Design a protein with these regions (language model features):
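N-terminal Rossmann-like FAD-binding beta1-loop-alpha1 element of flavoenzymes
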Residues: 3-29, 405-410
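Short hydrophobic core segments
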Residues: 5-7, 30, 132, 152-169, ...
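Glycine-rich FAD pyrophosphate-binding loop
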Residues: 21-45
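An anion/pyrophosphate-binding glycine-rich loop and adjacent beta-alpha core
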Residues: 34-36, 41-42, 50, 56-57, ...
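Glycine-rich active-site loop/strand segments that organize a redox cofactor
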Residues: 47-95
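Feature captures the FAD/FMN-dependent oxidoreductase FAD-binding
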Residues: 76-157
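A glycine-rich dinucleotide-binding beta-alpha-beta segment and adjacent secondary-structure elements
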Residues: 127-129, 134, 307-387
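Glycine-rich loop(s) and the adjacent beta-strand/alpha-helix scaffold that form part
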Residues: 157-203
Length: 410
């Protein structure tokens, strides 16, 4: 039996404590907040998307960084294992669009409560308001924690599960990176991911609140396509957000961080080819041939988007439809298929769902999450240089890495 000290009482820390305790270890969780699972409480808009019910192979496809590192842990504790864990603990689950798995109650508090009950059932010692200042190793092995009040907590093993630096109001302030660096670990520079993006065009605030459904969004660096997907997006006072944009940020964030502008091209009518769309526009023009242009195209766009599209078309809004040239019409059709804005940067960590970057995984054993540099030191969750798309995949990473760490300490 080992004395296991876990730094951080978020998803990864809670999971890891349960698995370590099931092995018969004496387990202590140190959480600096007044309660456990503070970030979990707000995930999935307060509903907590616990995992994704896709095939296990698809878990890797939805990872953005270091998916090969997760091979052992994803298969060691699969998405089905996560679902079984909660169901066996008494939490009923449901699967929604995109295979997203939520508690039937739609309350993240029920997920946290279930994890807490399992911790208590397995004898985990929970220490709230417990701020760890240092993680100390001696002779290449974990030795003790130094608390904020100067006291020491000795143990045989330590799992760092402090999360990243997104949603800092929940206590995610990057402590784990500092602890890891102090023991010789290299850190991939943390950056916001799954985050809205800023746009340069000055008409963007006029579109604030406009949601576009069933559009194709493609991000280009010059002529090089970086990301493309179909779905829903939202305009804000600063730029763009919504599911498509949040996912895109995971792929294009590194380039935007280098102060490099990118083009976001939105196909407003992806179900139609340019020829089919031209035929549709022609029908609108024929039906309204005596109307002014601004009044003839109201059926093509949401009301908020209409003045912007008319302005960008370069066609006089007062012009009668029956005198619009073929060239003007074709340019208008092209605009509908290629509505383009300039991405200038990511929003900051306060708005990021997760953190990209963290403890370099080359220095961590992928089967056990133990440090290759310090014996008895383990990592779990977002503190590692691992990130994935939305849909329950990041919580699956938390669960799988926590299982690998906790279940391998005896």
């Amino acid at each position: 039996m080992s004395k296991v000290l876990i730094v951080g009482g978020g998803a990864a820390g809670m999971f890891a404590s349960i698995f370590a305790a099931k092995n018969g270890n004496e387990v202590h969780v140190f959480e600096k907040n007044e309660k456990l699972g503070k970030k979990l409480f707000i995930t999935g808009k307060g509903r907590c998307n616990v995992t994704n019910a896709c095939d296990v192979d698809e878990l890797f496809q939805n990872m953005v960084s270091n998916e090969k590192f997760m091979y052992s842990s994803f298969y060691g504790f699969t998405n089905q294992d996560v679902m079984d864990f909660f169901e066996n603990a008494g939490l009923r689950l449901k699967t929604e669009r995109g295979n997203r798995v939520f508690p039937q109650s739609d309350h993240s508090s029920d997920v946290i409560r279930t994890l807490e009950l399992e911790m208590k059932r397995n004898g985990v010692h929970i220490h709230l308001y417990s701020n760890v200042e240092k993680v100390v190793a001696e002779d290449g092995r974990f030795s003790y924690l130094v608390m904020a009040d100067g006291s020491k907590e000795e143990g045989d093993a330590c799992i760092i599960a402090t999360g990243g630096v997104s949603y800092q109001t929940t206590g995610s302030t990057g402590d784990g990176y500092r602890f890891a660096e102090a023991m010789g670990h290299k850190i991939t520079e943390p950056a916001p991911s799954l985050v809205p993006m800023n746009v340069r065009e000055e008409y963007i605030p006029a579109l604030m609140g406009l949601s576009l459904r069933n559009v194709q969004a493609t991000v280009y660096d010059g002529k090089k396509e970086l990301y493309s997907d179909f779905g829903e997006m939202l305009f804000t006072h600063f730029g763009v957000s919504g599911p498509l944009i949040i996912s895109a940020s995971a792929y294009v964030g590194k380039i935007l961080q280098k102060k490099h502008e990118l083009k976001l091209v939105i196909d407003l009518k992806p179900a139609l080819s340019e020829e089919q769309l031209d035929a549709r526009v022609l029908r609108e023009f024929d039906a309204n041939h005596n109307k002014q242009f601004k009044n003839a195209v109201t059926g093509l766009f949401p009301a908020k988007l209409l003045p912007v599209m008319i302005h960008l078309s370069g066609i006089d809004p007062e012009k009668k439809v029956n005198v619009i040239t073929k060239e003007e019409r074709m340019n208008f059709v092209h605009l509908i298929k290629h509505f383009t804005v300039t991405l200038t940067g990511l929003r900051d960590f306060k708005e990021a769902i997760i953190t990209r970057g963290g403890v370099k995984v080359k220095e961590v054993n992928p089967s056990t999450m133990e440090s290759k540099l310090v014996q008895g030191l383990y990592f779990a969750g977002e503190v590692l240089d691992l990130d994935a798309l939305t849909g329950g995949f990041n919580l699956q990473i938390a669960g799988s890495t926590a299982y690998a760490a906790g279940s391998n300490i005896w």
